[in-house]
Each structure stands twice: as structure tokens, then as C-alpha cells.
Amino acid sequence: MAIKSRTNHSKATPTAAGIVKIAGIQMASGPSVAANLSEAERLIKIAADQGAKLVVLPEYFAIMGVKDTDKVKAAEQEGSGQIQQFLSATAKKRDVWIVAGSIPIQSETKGKVYNACMVYDNKGKLVARYNKIHLFGLNLGNEKYHEESTIVPGNQVVTVDSPFGKIGLSICYDLRFPELYRAMGNVDLILVPSAFTETTGKAHWETLIRARAIENLCYVLAPAQGGYHASGRETHGDSMIVDPWGVVLDRLPRGSGVVIASMNLDYQASLRKSLPALTHRTVFK
């Protein structure tokens, strides 16, 4: 499969002084879209009231069904549907950029959807969409996951020019593939909305997030599902924000809530000047 790159450009004004508050939402979503949207609205308000200008929801925030096929039934066409209407209206109402960790978007393949990360600006406009490229598969004891049975993989690396710098979009299992982030170029912020299992999360989650931040000298915001779900699945949680030096700025081990921190682009630039690792890269073929 050929992977392409795309950058979405925004006309928004850059944030003054290079400092902005960013927030991640942690949830334990269930099979009711209405209930999940209500919880997301509550948590987005908390983040906005604390001064966040960018709020990122976890993977599958709108539906964690009893069966994998539940998300296929809940899939929407791009540009319409209750989930997207909620995201647009809430971004405008709260005057924040909202990144919908992922929602199911209809595909051309019967019985399958795209697992799509949708980015809305503070006017409620959809400015970018990323379809998850790497589909999770696990066969470990009693745990078996095969996302490819209901999801069509994406084929584009997506970045967004925003008031908060250049943002790279990814979802959950993508975190294990550093070449994806290298393909983004020099981004200021990587987003990794996730639903890591408890098994893989407790073993690898923090290590992977901090590694991506350090090797790319950028901020990483990783909001996650955290708790027990109607399917019997347990997700790891531990949503976190990590700075370009690998320091964890905020984290939430379990349950619903918000992580929030200030992103300082001047600090990031100083680190990249002191340790110019990005300019020292050698690309091997």
C-alpha cells in the first residue's frame, strides 16, 4: 500500500508568545452515542474553562460497543451525522479547536468503516481528517483483537498547520511505528488519541509516548480510553502530555477527566537548537 502525505493549512492567527494550553480528555466510553457525547461535552467544558485552546478526545470516544460491528452501524458520512454536528457546534460554542480522537466514517467497503481522526477549528469548521493507517491486531491468551475485520486502513500521513504550530495526527496503534512520525516532518505537536488495552498499555504505553516525544523533539498529547467497557474490554487510560525533553507534564491514570498543560514553542525551539538531532538524521533506503 502506497502511503501519501498531506498538510492541511489553516488561516488562523498564531498564538502570541508561542505559549498555549492544550488538553486531553479521558473517558470510559460505552455503547450509547448520546451518553458518550454528553460526557464529552461535560469534559470539554472543564478543559475550556481552564483555558485550553486545543482539546483532544480519545479514540472511539463516541462509541465503544459491545461488538466490533456496533461501530459500523454507528458510522456517519463525512459532513453529516449527530457526532460531527456535536463536534462542530461544541468547538464553536467553547471557542476551542477540537480533535475527535476517532469516529467511524463510512467507507466504500461493505461492513467496514474508516477509523477517522477529525479536526475542527474554533469556528466549528472541519479542517483535517486522518484515517488510521496501522490496524491493531493481538492474539495473546484470551485477548484477541483484529481491527482489520471492520476497519479500512488509511493511506495518507496527515499534518495540520494551526495556531499552535504544526500538528501531526495519529491514532493508538500508530504509536508503535516511528517511521510514521518521521514522515510527518518537523512537527510541533503529535496527537495520539488511543484506546490501549490494559495488557499492552501497562507494558509499553508510557515508554512509547516518551520515545516519540524525545526522538522528534516535540510535544505529545495522548488522550486515552481508561476503564472497563460493555464488551468486557479493559483499557489502560493514563492519558498524558509529554514535552520535547520527555518530561510528563500531566497525566490521569484512570477514569474520566482532563489532562492539561502549557505548550511552549519557544522552549521547544531552544531544545532543537541545543540538540539539533532532527538536522542530523540520516535517511536509509
Where are these regions (language model features)?
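CN hydrolase (nitrilase-like) catalytic-core segments centered on the catalytic cysteine
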Residues: 78-99, 166, 172-259
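Short beta-strand scaffold segments in enzyme catalytic cores
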Residues: 100-102, 116-119, 158-160, 239-241, ...
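N-terminal, active-site-proximal structural segment of metallo-dependent hydrolase catalytic domains
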Residues: 2-54, 60, 64
